Amino acid sequence: MLRVVSWNINGIRSPLQGLACQEPSSCPTALRRVLDELDADIVCLQETKVTRDVLTEPLAIVEGYNSYFSFSRSRSGYSGVATFCKDSATPVAAEEGLSGVFATLNGDIGCYGNMDEFTQEELRVLDSEGRALLTQHKIRTLEGKEKTLTLINVYCPHADPGKPERLTFKMRFYRLLQMRAEALLAAGSHVIILGDLNTAHRPIDHCDASSLECFEEDPGRKWMDGLLSNPGDEAGPHIGLFMDSYRYLHPKQQRAFTCWSVVSGARHLNYGSRLDYVLGDRALVIDTFQASFLLPEVMGSDHCPVGAVLNVSCVPAKQCPALCTRFLPEFAGTQLKILRFLVPLEQEPVREQQVLQPSHQIQAQRQPRKACMHSTRLRKSQGGPKRKQKNLMSYFQPSSSLSQTSGVELPTLPLVGPLTTPKTAEEVATATVLEEKNKVPESKDEKGERTAFWKSMLSGPSPMPLCGGHREPCVMRTVKKTGPNFGRQFYMCARPRGPPSDPSSRCNFFLWSRPS
């Protein structure tokens, strides 16, 4: 059996926070414990949010696994995918990206198809965010036949409604993904596409599809309609070459969600959407998929893992592909040249006369150190007269030699003001009485404002209003969407978001904290 698991981890360090490790990124066994709990031969992670310069050895080298990373080249702490294969499932080839732009011609997979509709610059941009990683494996069927299986670990872009250019980017990425997958399939390899596709395909895959305008007309859903097919569909030019393994085995399963809003606490009531998939070519899904599952009990991210079990065995390669993380120079154990660590530094100009020193001291400092050492040895060898112990009072006497030999003028302190004699007690009392008489009496309004201010400061914040549906204290939120209300605060029900028919879910109470 071959078990594969995919998980949008929302930062590869996130699930490690709950482990007993003071510094998760330096804990040598933390990530292995996470991988072992997933109990899979191949684990595909999305949204790792690490770049190569911050990748540490405990995250890259895990005992019993060989790992492969794709990093974002455009932004730091953004996107990124990684694939961890058990040594018993070592791939025969691995490649970063979908287009071949970052291919190294050493252990790559190939089979790109006709990409003439893309420019080289567009392909580079599509692959520069570290959203796709391919591993190719040898598998053996129950009949003993060896075949090729290519896994495409993918993290598809999210289309921000406020940024229409991101929708274009997302659809072009979808197009590139489909072309590469179909080219691999045409070359004779079985193909699995697994990861976060960032689209809920059908109304059954969304908690509130009825409230979304033109749900089925969404460009991402229409793309999935063309990519996928149903079990009963007959093969043809307009039939998708891939199948959704979960819907193939669980066609009517309700509330099978994989992603929830953290802000609204929707996971408590399972009010989310299914964005994570394990897709396979039709023949592979129908012939070998024994199970397709979700793991909503696994915490640590706003997504839960998804996976599948195939009725095949993996034939491990004798050697890891060149893309394997253990072959990176920083982890390979090879000695690096010192020139890689040397960076020319700009020296600041020496500031002259930062500290005033007597001229005889400056001349003494400018003498070569070698001459000083020579004169010291000479005095010791000649055995000259020893210095007598000085009297303590000599340190408090003015030195005449210093003023004679030094040409430095010492600054003089200017007088602050004329010297005055201290006032008597009667004069102080008289001045105090005059000062009190000259004071302007404080008005009642000013006194009242000051009293109210200190009362509000000492009494603490006002109590939260009660929501209308449950009569429970509300929570305060801040508007973060750009617009006329940006930055304003409001009160809303503190319960998690859920189905409107569920009485334990959030009610529709809303109140601005301050009137506009």
From Swiss-Prot:
Its cofactor is Mg(2+); Mn(2+). InterPro entries: AP_endonuc_1 (IPR004808), AP_endonuclease_F1_BS (IPR020847), Endo/exonu/phosph_ase_sf (IPR036691), Endo/exonuclease/phosphatase (IPR005135), Znf_GRF (IPR010666). There is a cross-link at K370 (Glycyl lysine isopeptide (Lys-Gly) (interchain with G-Cter in ubiquitin)). A zinc finger (GRF-type) spans 467-516. One of its GO terms (biological process) is DNA recombination. It is an enzyme of class 3 (hydrolase). Its EC number is 3.1.11.2. Residues 389-396 are annotated as: Required for the interaction and colocalization with PCNA in nuclear foci in presence of oxidative-induced DNA damaging agents. Residues 367-389 have a biased composition (Basic residues). The record marks H303 as: Interaction with DNA substrate. It is found in: Nucleus; Cytoplasm; Mitochondrion. Its main location: nucleus. Expressed in lymphocytes, thymocytes and splenocytes (at protein level). Highly expressed in the thymus and weakly expressed in the bone marrow, spleen, eye, kidney, lung, brain and uterus. Signal peptide: none annotated. Disruption phenotype: Mice show abnormalities in proliferating haemopoietic organs, such as dyshematopoiesis, defect in lymphopoiesis, and delayed S-phase and G2/M-phase arrest. Ubiquitinated by the CUL9-RBX1 complex. Ubiquitinated by MKRN3 at Lys-370 leading to proteasomal degradation. The record marks N198 as: Transition state stabilizer. The active site is at Y155, D196, H303. Mg(2+) 2 binds at D196, N198, H303. Induction: Up-regulated in both the nucleus and the cytosol of B cells stimulated to switch. The PCNA interacting protein (PIP) box mediates interaction with PCNA and recruitment to DNA single-strand breaks. Functions as a weak apurinic/apyrimidinic (AP) endodeoxyribonuclease in the DNA base excision repair (BER) pathway of DNA lesions induced by oxidative and alkylating agents. Initiates repair of AP sites in DNA by catalyzing hydrolytic incision of the phosphodiester backbone immediately adjacent to the damage, generating a single-strand break with 5'-deoxyribose phosphate and 3'-hydroxyl ends. Also displays double-stranded DNA 3'-5' exonuclease, 3'-phosphodiesterase activities. Interacts with PCNA. This interaction is increased by misincorporation of uracil in nuclear DNA. This is DNA-(apurinic or apyrimidinic site) endonuclease 2. The gene is Apex2.
